[in-house]
């Protein structure tokens, strides 16, 4: 179903049963598969391919030569009808790829709202990306990567499969992420190491001095010489009594499976 107010360029192919909502724009030479749904006011500039069981929300901009919902590159994949979900107000720049999930995981690759993926970003199967993230040119995510809110990843950075990157993290360009990255920190390098708190990012997002001070104390606990994970958790639980922002650290360590960068 194509809404009467949507525009589809005559050179584009929209398969039967695809759904395109009101005031969307499908530019020249696009391909929309039969199980795709595109939300209102979403723009496909040109030469965009959207395959498989894929939902694209409202007010997204997808630029030329991007591929969304294609079969993933996991060697175990054998054609299962897995999904891609993309929220609202995302910008997906040229040549970016977002692959569908696998049955070995949650069957879905999921993108939140208000993200910017710059040129040549690759998001592999089963990744989960929250909201307000920026990935610069040529960022590559392996399968099953989980990224929190307000994360900035510099260009040419590669993230190993199954890694977790906590909310409000900033990662410098040309980095290699092979372990989990705790919330609120700066990291860079190959392999990436921590460089303190993302103070500038927190100030821009309106964190007050008291909260930033508590986050700084959490950082000192995590990276105190000789502190093991059990002690870290105990000290963070105690610190969380003064500010619930510390729960982001506690949730991170509860879900971390690859160890964290040091």
From Swiss-Prot:
InterPro entries for the chain: Acetyltransf_C (IPR029098), Acetyltransf_C_sf (IPR037157), Hexapep (IPR001451), Hexapep_transf_CS (IPR018357), Lipid_A_LpxA (IPR010137), Trimer_LpxA-like_sf (IPR011004)
GO molecular function: acyl-[acyl-carrier-protein]-UDP-N-acetylglucosamine O-acyltransferase activity
Compartments reported by the entry: Cytoplasm
GO terms for biological process, alphabetical: lipid A biosynthetic process
Keywords: Acyltransferase, Cytoplasm, Lipid A biosynthesis, Lipid biosynthesis, Lipid metabolism, Repeat, Transferase
Quaternary structure (record): Homotrimer.
Family listed: Belongs to the transferase hexapeptide repeat family. LpxA subfamily.
Physiological role: Involved in the biosynthesis of lipid A, a phosphorylated glycolipid that anchors the lipopolysaccharide to the outer membrane of the cell.
Name recorded for this polypeptide: Acyl-[acyl-carrier-protein]--UDP-N-acetylglucosamine O-acyltransferase
Gene name linked to the record: lpxA
